[in-house]
Amino acid sequence: MIGPARALIAEDERLLREELREHLNALWPSLEIVAAVGDGKAAMRAIDAHGPDVLFLDIQMPGATGLEVARYASGRAHVVFVTAFDEFAVAAFE
C-alpha cells in the first residue's frame, strides 16, 4: 500500500488532466491532488504555493516544458513524466 502524499498534475490537455486525476484517485486513495494545472509556469507557481511531494508532468506544455519544471523543482519533489512522445524519453532522464 502506498502512503499519503501531496501531488501536482501539470498537463495542458484538459481531458487528459482530468483522466489522470481519476486514475490516480482510484489507484492511490491517500494521494491528495493539491493542484492540477495546464501549463508549465502555473506548475512552477503551484510548486511554490503547495509544496507537493510528487509531480506528474507532461513534457510538452506551454509556458515551460515539463523538463524545465522538473529542473525548477529539483530536490523538492519526486517527478513522474507523462508523455506520448518517444523522443523526450531520453531527455527526461538526463
Question: What annotation goes with each model-predicted range?
Answer:
Residues 11:
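Conserved acidic carboxylate
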Residues 20, 37, 89-92:
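Generic structural signal for conserved hydrophobic packing positions in ordered secondary structure
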Residues 28-34, 77:
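A generic structural motif
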Residues 34-41:
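Conserved Asp/Asn-Gly motif in the active-site loop of CheY-like receiver
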Residues 45, 49-94:
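CheY-like receiver
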Residues 18-26:
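Charged docking surfaces used in two-component/phosphorelay signaling
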Residues 1-8:
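Non-catalytic signal-transmission and effector/linker regions of two-component phosphorelay proteins
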